[in-house]
A protein has these predicted regions:
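Domain-level signal for soluble alpha/beta catalytic cores
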Residues: 1-428
Length: 428
């Protein structure tokens, strides 16, 4: 994993807005009408190449494939790659998992309106009915091969692929096979180890997306206690560490956010209450939501908390959930204040969460997505200038061209200084 050794590097959380061409194939596949697998595969390879090229053009350093290969959401995609789960008709007796939570209890009118607008409706449960085992090697290799091909001919620092952490695999899953949730989580972790290792073995960083680490608080407390919640998260993170056995620490990014949905989030657990649990996960980088108005103030926790030795902090300095584009100066401020606490070389600038948690959903307009990433890159350039006393070795992008144009003038000025000094001595 590269570090910000001479400038602030940039990245994002992974998912990017899918183009209509991919969505058309997915709609046909879901409906079972006129689906052409070969055409879909060709389209996917073409669009992954385009989105990687666009990230490079904007100036993002550590890029992803946009999660374009996932036909369902960031967490539900696993049902296409793991055996042992079954879709069953939704059982209203057990309650709709998407209508639970303290925030929803506090703002029922708001959430009723939001659900109606977003057409939120649960029609199936996902149930563990047999031994969980990984079967998605071919699908994953397709995504890996597309990403490798897309990276040829573009200049970026590194590539990563985001996947679901064990606790976030099919959230609110049901279980009729294993004795308890602990056994099911362990089985999922062992199955997902195959996916994690396959990504790293092909030369990429693996990012484990774990929204459930924080969201579980909103779902559990009340009626459960805070200690009950911490016990559950600790269990899940032990599963994460076992699921990444055999993978070098520096190849792992661990992402935690507070669920990403566009709600009040007044019942989110404060990071100060779980940062110790987050850092229990063995990872080379911790990718955290830190730019939204509910959590931005929490940068101050890093006054007292130390990163594990060798680890990197990837703070969200750009929000994914608003069409307001952050000013690069604000992005710079967010980066600099953290860099002064944890060390400039230990910060890579990122986004709060993905821009499209599933193929048919997007948090902002596509043009705004790219404008935000441009603001991220420019803010990182400004932060590099302040932290290193110069523009930083920007390497790519317009920042490099601008600095190249300025160099001759600086050298000329430097050559003139001795001459001026000599004139002063003669005058004396």
């Amino acid at each position: 994993m590269h570090r910000s050794t001479n400038r602030i590097l940039t990245t994002h959380v992974g998912s990017l807005i899918r183009p209509d061409s991919i969505r058309r194939h997915l709609r046909a596949k879901q409906k079972g009408e006129g689906y052409d697998a070969a055409a879909h595969a060709a389209c996917l390879a073409q669009e992954v190449a385009a989105v990687v090229r666009k990230q490079a053009e904007v100036g993002v350093d550590v890029v992803s494939d946009g999660e374009f290969g996932k036909g369902i959401s960031w967490s539900q995609y696993v049902i296409e790659r793991v055996a042992g789960f079954e879709r069953r008709p939704f059982d209203p007796k057990t309650g709709n998992p998407f209508t639970r939570g303290a925030d929803r209890t506090r703002f029922p009118e708001f959430y009723a309106e939001l659900d109606a607008r977003d057409h939120v409706e649960t029609i199936t449960d996902t149930v563990a009915v047999a031994p969980i085992r990984y079967t998605g090697q071919a699908l994953l290799q397709r995504d890996i091969d597309n990403f490798k091909a897309a990276l040829r001919g573009v200049k970026v620092v590194e590539g990563f692929l985001p996947v679901a952490a064990p606790a976030s695999v099919i959230p609110d899953r049901k279980n009729v096979y294993y004795r308890n949730e602990e056994e099911l989580a362990e089985a999922i972790g062992q199955a997902m180890n195959v996916e994690y290792k396959q990504i790293v073995d092909n030369g990429f960083l693996v990012q484990l997306d774990d929204a459930r680490a924080a969201v579980t608080y909103d779902r559990m407390v009340p009626p459960a206690s805070f200690q009950d919640y911490r016990k559950r998260v600790r269990l899940y993170q032990d599963v994460v560490n076992r699921a990444t056995q055999g993978i070098p620490t520096e190849k792992i990014r661990y992402h935690v956010c507070w669920g990403s949905w566009p709600g009040p989030h007044t019942t989110d657990v404060p990071i100060k209450d779980i940062v110790d649990l987050i850092l229990r996960v063995r990872a080379g980088a911790y990718v955290l939501e830190m730019a939204n108005p509910r959590h931005e103030h929490e940068w101050q926790v890093w006054r007292d908390v130390k990163l594990p030795k060798g680890a990197v902090l990837i703070p969200g300095v750009i929000s994914h959930a608003t069409n307001v584009v952050e000013h690069p100066e604000l992005v710079k401020e967010r980066i600099v204040r953290l860099a002064k606490l944890v060390g400039r070389e230990n910060v890579i600038a990122g986004t709060d969460c993905g821009f499209a948690q599933q193929p048919f959903y997007q948090r902002v307009h596509p043009t705004i997505q790219w404008a935000k990433l441009q603001a991220l890159v420019e803010g990182a350039r400004l932060a590099s200038k302040e932290l290193w006393g110069r523009g930083g070795k920007a390497g790519r992008s317009a920042a490099k061209k601008a600095s190249a144009k300025k160099r001759p003038a600086k050298k000329t000025a430097a050559r003139k200084r001795p001459a001026k000094a000599a004139k002063k001595r003669r005058a004396a």
